[in-house]
């Protein structure tokens, strides 16, 4: 599944919620993840793979992901290491701001869920729920400050 939407539309919260419910999973931040992804996948062989901001990852990685989704196998030759392993039955959840940055074949492998931009009031409600250890008024205040930065 791919969660698509503007910044601050709770895409990452969905991924983290999935990982919280299903413990056999890994999370990668596509905006600053390195080749360590392949090492982690090879070592852990997770049943759930969550990639935040897949649209910011290089096209070469997106192509490798497509091959993996089609075959369940990772086969990559890099300068320093070769990878050749299987992960059968893994479920993949990703987020992206701009779906057009993914190739059409990769897009076709995902169910798409479009998340709209929050209204300011909804954003404040979410802030109170996401920051439950804080008092409701402090969580709401943080949401207001964040909103003034132009995020919601």
Residue spans of the language-model regions?
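Conserved AAA+/SF3 P-loop NTPase catalytic/coupling segment centered on the Walker-B
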Residues: 14-17, 45-72, 99-109
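Conserved nucleotide-binding/hydrolysis micro-motifs of P-loop NTPases
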Residues: 7-9, 32-34, 55-57, 92, ...
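Conserved AAA+ ATPase small/helical "lid" subdomain
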Residues: 135-152
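Short glycine-rich substrate-engagement loop in P-loop NTPases that contacts/grips substrate
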Residues: 22-48
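Conserved AAA+ ATPase core "coupling" helix
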Residues: 88, 102-135
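Walker A/P-loop
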Residues: 1-27
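Conserved RecA-like P-loop NTPase ATPase core
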Residues: 3, 12, 18, 37-38, ...
């Amino acid at each position: 599944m791919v969660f698509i939407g503007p910044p601050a539309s709770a895409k990452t919260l969905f991924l983290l919620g999935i990982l919280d419910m299903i413990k056999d999973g890994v999370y990668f931040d596509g905006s600053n993840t390195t080749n360590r992804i392949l090492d982690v996948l090879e070592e852990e062989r997770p049943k759930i793979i969550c990639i935040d901001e897949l649209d910011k990852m290089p096209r070469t990685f997106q192509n490798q992901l497509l091959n993996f989704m089609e075959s369940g196998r990772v086969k990559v030759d890099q300068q320093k290491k070769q990878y050749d392993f299987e992960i059968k039955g893994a479920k993949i959840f990703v987020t992206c701001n701009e779906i057009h940055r993914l190739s059409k074949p990769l897009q076709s492998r995902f169910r798409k869920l479009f998340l709209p931009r929050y209204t300011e009031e909804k954003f404040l409600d979410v802030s109170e729920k996401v920051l439950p250890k804080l008092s409701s008024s402090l969580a709401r205040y943080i949401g207001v400050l964040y909103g003034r930065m132009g995020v919601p």
